[in-house]
Structures are given as C-alpha cells and as structure tokens.
A protein has these predicted regions:
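A residue-level marker of the well-folded mature domains of exported/periplasmic proteins
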Residues: 27-284
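Bacterial signal peptide processing site
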Residues: 22-25
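Positively charged n-region of N-terminal signal peptides that target proteins for export
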Residues: 1-9
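C-terminal motif of bacterial Sec signal peptides marking the signal peptidase cleavage site
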Residues: 16-20
C-alpha cells in the first residue's frame, strides 16, 4: 500500500498545479514521509500484505466535477488509480461538495466505516476535521490537501500535501507584468489606471485571508514587479472558495476602480468572466 498511497498523492498534487486554490504549506508530514510511513504496511504487487482488491481510498472533496479545482483533483486521482490498476468505484469512496464544517468529519468517518485505509480531503477548511478523524482513527492514514498543522500535531497518520502553487502564481505575475509594460509603454492606459503615486493599478480576487491565499497574491505581485516596478495592488476577498457571483462582483469592482489586470485565487470562472465581459464591452 505504500506505493499506492504515494502515487495517489503524486497525481493529486500534480493536478493541483493547474488550479487556483492551494497551499504552499506542506510540512514534514507530507508526501515523502507519508510514502515511507512504517504504519503503512500493505503492499500492491507481491510479498505479504493486502492486494489491490483489498485497497480502498476515500476522497472528501469540497466541490465536484463542475468546479475546476475539484475537477483537477478528480482527473489526477482517476489517472493514478488507472496507472495502479485500481477501479475508481470498487477501490474508492467519493464524497462530493463537502463543506468546511462538521459534515467533513462525518464524511471522513463514513469513508473509514466503508473500509478506507487512507482518506484525502482537498480544502484548507477541511483540515481541523481531518485532524480530529486522524486522532480518533490511528489505523487510517489521513491526508489534508492543503493544510499546515500535520507536523505540529505529532500524529504519524496525519499528513499535509500540496504543490508549491505560489511559484506558478509568480510566473502568472511575470506574464501580467509583461502585459502591463506593453500597455503602459504603448500609451494605452488612462489616468484612472494610475493611483495618486503614479503606480499602475492591479487587482486580485482572493477566497479567504488564509496564508495560502496571501502567499499566492504576494507571489503574483512580486512577479508583476519583476517586470514592471511601479504597480499597486488591491485585494478583495469573497470569503468562499467557489462563488461565481461573488468573484464576478469583486472583479467588476476592481475593474471599476481602474485595475488593468485582475488575478485570482478562487475556484470559479467568475472573475475571469468579468474581465472578459469588460474587454468585450471596451471598458478595459
């Protein structure tokens, strides 16, 4: 089961590289430690232990296939299971649209009751409930993607895992900076696009004021500044990972305030749609 556990982590983490909600806060109770955890004793291809047919993993997901962040996880998980010869029905328990409240704990426990040896959650707000379940079920490996408390918890069966998504946000900022430079050098910006200090205004739609969101928009901002130094950034939070209307309205407000670039760390296309509509209307 060590190989199964590690590869499921790898594919899920690779999937996260392409989406917007994530944490850079992986700690020592992360993929490498999880893969080598002595408590994980089953095997997948010979020797003593259980076979693939006996392996079952639970996936407690904050959204479903209609939401980009969770969809990327689903694609990664199904790819991993296919590579390992696992059946996405027989070897998995799926929990969709699980909010960041006590129902997350209930969903994890139900996965355990159905025979899961490892359970993954995929949202920062799931973390405390995942830790609670790990404390009560030491025989089960529980992975919180994202998160930052596994190391401090001291629990050998509780892990955090995620990609360093802030690196991708820095690259996105570099691309945004190139566009800003093009617009500024070409004289295509109006007075409303500059603040009182002569900085070009940019905006950012964030889900929550969590460390992972702050690190993401900081990386984005630094990426922009690496290309075009004179910028200022306004951040608006929606207090939700997935709120199409809220994200759209936040982006509209930023555009109305003169922001020429809008980044985001949330799960829907709301902000992007607002930018597309503004461009089509010729307002930005």
């Amino acid at each position: 089961m060590k190989r199964l556990f590690a590869l499921l982590l790898v594919f899920a983490m690779v999937a996260c590289l392409f989406v917007g909600c994530g944490s850079n806060g992986s700690d020592d109770n992360s993929i490498s430690n999880a893969a080598n955890d002595n408590n994980v004793t089953a095997k997948d291809d010979g020797g003593s232990g259980t076979s693939n047919a006996d392996f079952k993993a639970g996936f407690v997901l904050v959204g479903d296939e209609n939401e980009g962040y969770t969809y990327a996880h689903i694609v990664g998980i199904e790819k991993a299971m296919g590579e390992l010869g696992l059946d996405k029905s027989a070897n998995a328990v799926w929990k969709y649209s699980v909010p960041e409240d006590e129902s997350c704990y209930d969903a994890i426990v139900d996965c355990i009751d159905q025979g899961c040896q490892v359970v993954f959650t995929n949202s920062y707000g799931h973390q405390s409930f995942a830790q609670q379940a790990a404390e009560e079920h030491p025989e089960v490996q529980i992975v919180s993607m994202t998160g930052d408390t596994a190391k401090r918890s001291g629990l050998p069966n509780f892990h955090n895992a995620f990609t360093k998504i802030f690196e991708a946000r820095y690259v996105a900022g570099v691309v945004a900076g190139m566009k800003i430079k093009e617009l500024a050098d070409g004289g295509k910006l109006s007075d409303s696009n500059y603040d009182a200090d002569g900085n070009v205004k940019i905006g950012y739609v964030g889900a929550y004021p969590y460390a992972e969101v702050v690190s993401g928009y900081t990386a984005f901002f630094q990426g922009v500044k690496s290309v075009y130094e004179k910028v200022s950034m306004e951040v608006q939070y929606t207090n939700s990972w997935f709120d199409i209307t809220g994200e759209n309205e936040a982006a509209v407000a930023l555009i109305a305030d003169g922001c020429v670039i809008v980044g985001q760390h949330a799960d829907s296309t709301g902000a992007a749609s607002a930018c597309e509509a503004a461009l089509s209307a010729g307002t930005t």
